């Protein structure tokens, strides 16, 4: 079985919330895709409940797309502590952390239920499992700690 970088990471040494560049893959024609670890809560200490995580996922799909050129996808970790973010090119962890911070601020401060995309039976595979209340609470808690652009040393972005 191939090695998975995320499983090689010592989860006891990281300090969430943070943004970490996992890898940059280069295609046959030189195109680059960056994979980021958007870790919102400390591994093995907490996990975001599925309803809140699901709603954050749906909102980040649009909010990060508006803030990061080359956005491809943002998918939750199975452990429910954060997300993988895939983008074309090589944005800095600082730029990604700032975009994440702005997006979580938008969720915390401005988003209403009507703003949450994909909440119908036609548009979501598990449309009943959403919680804007939870998404707002978790966004608030994450922002209170600050988002670092370094996973091992706290360097909170403004």
Curated annotation (Swiss-Prot):
InterPro entries: LuxS_sf, Metalloenz_LuxS/M16, S-ribosylhomocysteinase. GO terms for biological process: quorum sensing. The keyword Iron applies. One of its GO terms (molecular function) is iron ion binding. Fe cation binds at residues 54, 58, 124. It holds the Pfam family LuxS. It catalyses: S-(5-deoxy-D-ribos-5-yl)-L-homocysteine = (S)-4,5-dihydroxypentane-2,3-dione + L-homocysteine. Its EC number is 4.4.1.21. Its cofactor is Fe cation. The keyword Iron applies. Binds 1 Fe cation per subunit. Belongs to the LuxS family. Homodimer. Involved in the synthesis of autoinducer 2 (AI-2) which is secreted by bacteria and is used to communicate both the cell density and the metabolic potential of the environment. The regulation of gene expression in response to changes in cell density is called quorum sensing. Catalyzes the transformation of S-ribosylhomocysteine (RHC) to homocysteine (HC) and 4,5-dihydroxy-2,3-pentadione (DPD). This is S-ribosylhomocysteine lyase. It comes from Lactobacillus johnsonii (strain CNCM I-12250 / La1 / NCC 533). The gene is luxS.
């Amino acid at each position: 079985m191939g090695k998975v970088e995320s499983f090689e990471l010592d989860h006891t040494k990281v300090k969430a919330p943070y943004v970490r560049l996992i890898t940059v893959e280069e295609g046959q024609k030189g195109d680059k895709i960056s994979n980021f670890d958007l870790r919102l809560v400390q591994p093995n200490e907490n996990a975001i409940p599925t309803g809140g995580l699901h709603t954050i996922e749906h909102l980040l799909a649009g909010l990060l797309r508006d803030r990061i050129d080359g956005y491809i996808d943002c998918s939750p970790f199975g452990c429910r502590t954060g997300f993988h973010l895939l983008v074309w090119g090589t944005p800095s962890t600082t730029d990604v952390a700032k975009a994440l911070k702005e997006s979580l601020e938008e969720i915390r401060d401005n988003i209403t239920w009507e703003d949450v995309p994909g909440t119908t039976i036609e548009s979501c595979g598990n449309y009943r499992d959403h919680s804007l209340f939870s998404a707002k609470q978790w966004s608030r808690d994450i922002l209170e700690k600050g988002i670092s652009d370094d996973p091992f040393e706290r360097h909170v972005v403004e």
